[in-house]
Amino acid sequence: MPSYTPPLRDMQFVMHEVLKVTDDLKLCPQHADTDADTINAVLEEGGKFASEVAFPLNISGDEEGCTLDKTTHEVTAPKGFKEAYAQYVQGGWAALSCDPAYGGQGLPFAVSYTHLTLPTILLV
């Protein structure tokens, strides 16, 4: 069975060595506490979700695809997508950069955007 290994080291290199994102975040009072460990934790957990939940859906996505009921105009996603999306939302991935007052995690967009480069984009 195929597997997916997220390029975490590459992503960490870009965030920390190329962009030096934590230096810029220190200039923003609301994100001054976002450090390299926090960024790495988000990348690692996002990578787990991508490889363990999202990536395996490629098979059902390719084999089943979406179906359209022409009478009701409803689209049905392939097997597993609804459950994976529920896990995506339950895990807080959809609200990483949203205001905590509204259920978000308050992370800077630069950090929350990184998970979109992983196969989780299949679920959004």
Give the role of each language-model region.
Residues 75-113:
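Non-catalytic terminal/interface segments that mediate subunit docking, oligomerization
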Residues 114-120:
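Conserved small/polar residues in nucleotide/adenosyl-binding loops
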Residues 1-69, 75:
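Extended, charge-enriched "interface" segments that sit outside catalytic cores
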Residues 10, 120-121:
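Intrinsically disordered, low-complexity regions enriched for glutamine and histidine
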